[in-house]
Amino acid sequence: MNKKNHEDSNSFKKYSAIKENDSVDVVLIGSGIMSATLGIYLKLLEPNWIIHSYERLNKVGQESSNAWNNAGTGHSAFCELNYTSINKDGSINISKAIKVNESFEISKQLWAYLIKEKILVNSSSFINTVPHMSFVWGENNINFLKKRFFYLKQNALFKDMLYSENYDIIKKWAPLIMEGRSINEKVAATRMEIGTDVNFGEITKQIFYYLKNKSNFFLYLNHDVIDIIRNKDKTWCLKVVDNILKKTIKINSKYVFIGSGGGALKLLQKSKIEQSIGYAGFPVGGQFLVTKNKKLTNNHQAKVYGKSPIGAPPMSVPHIDTRIINGEKVLLFGPFATFSSKFLKNGSYFDLFSSLTKENIIPILQVGINNFNLVKYLINQLLKSKRGKFNDLCKYLPTAKMKDWSLITAGQRVQIIKKDIEKGGILEFGTEIINSKDCTLSALLGASPGASTSASTMLDLLKIMFYDKINKSEWKSKLNKIFISYNKKIHESYEYTLEIRNYTSKILSL
């Protein structure tokens, strides 16, 4: 996308104020990648539906979807070791890796379709080829990586994966991680050439820029949804604050999607649906070390993921990433966990405390008691100085110099805590759709893998909220045009996997 396109995608014209007690078909709360994806689905499937989207900030995609607030990894389980666990018999469970990879392939199909339809423009502004690598040292970790490679290689999705313990080969793949390292040090790496770096914020902006220029779609920035109430006719009444006019308006909607990231839990609680009882959120922030030094950025073209320390949560996997943000190449290393009681980067310090209820306080306390390693990890992270964080970087880049790197604060993640009969409360690290009994209201809670699986996750949501339409010929016909693998399993055939990937790679210029 040229400079003018970038400026255009940021300039969202202001609509006239909402009319009191307006009735609409769908309300999208939040303007991140999830709401953008659901919004484009509904506009393609039901162009005559009236859709309102409310965003409390003055721009779309400014929380977790923003390029600087996430790692930008097209999560495809190529390099993330936490998606492959060890079974009791010592074998490797690759089921989650398959699910995550297939989900990302679905996202690429959606973006390819949107490029063909000129809804998205200039694919290099939001997705670029960056090989994905796993990199470990130490005998136990090397044995794990070798075994993981063996099991993944047998599946069509990962058949093209490479493995090496050879110093020179790994140095060719990623020079910076081997410079300054002894040639006798035992290390191992895997590599997938077709990995990507994704700017989810750019995708979000471009989709909303298209949507807000279409009839029957209304984007309201600086509008904050503060309450959701069930009407007698089973529709939903939303109280919306116009932060420009300092006015509260009521709006009625047949369907509501709460896609406001960390803000979703509190709005879900306000809806008072039975299914929300017992859910809580645990906020975890993140920091990255970043460099724009061209001597470094020009000498590293990969996303290199390591192995988490024992007891550390999945979101703690250390990685050194090539990023392309607004056309500029940078390197990021992290994440380093931070703690704030905010549920959103631009949220309130009261977020955590105001989300506490008599139903979720016990699950939260039980999670703290039952996850001592997590608590210990977070305390250690909070006590770690910039020098300590730089020392972690040196494990991956032995020749790194502190003067080249600065520390940035990324977005907030709110992990799911929910009631459990046996343990009282459990901490979940994935995402989960919570919906009302009649499926007219849904919320997305949780974090990783998040944005990478947005197309697949919102397809699942379509099946829940619009179960009476998803199998009708009109919707099926359209969905089959968008997704050439719709309702098919990609991983069952290597030839089919190649066909799908060649199709999307050609359109997305990968």
From Swiss-Prot:
Pathway: Carbohydrate metabolism; tricarboxylic acid cycle; oxaloacetate from (S)-malate (quinone route): step 1/1
Name of encoding gene: mqo
Annotated EC: 1.1.5.4
Protein name per UniProt: Probable malate:quinone oxidoreductase
Broad class of enzyme this protein falls into: oxidoreductase
The organism's place on the tree of life at top rank: Bacteria
Phylogenetic classification of the source organism: Bacteria, Pseudomonadati, Pseudomonadota, Gammaproteobacteria, Enterobacterales
UniProt keywords, alphabetically: FAD, Flavoprotein, Oxidoreductase, Tricarboxylic acid cycle
Catalytic activities: (S)-malate + a quinone = a quinol + oxaloacetate
HAMAP family referenced in this protein's UniProt entry, alphabetically: MQO (MF_00212)
Family: Belongs to the MQO family.
Necessary cofactors: FAD
GO molecular function, one term: L-malate dehydrogenase (quinone) activity
Species of origin: Wigglesworthia glossinidia brevipalpis
GO biological process: one example: tricarboxylic acid cycle
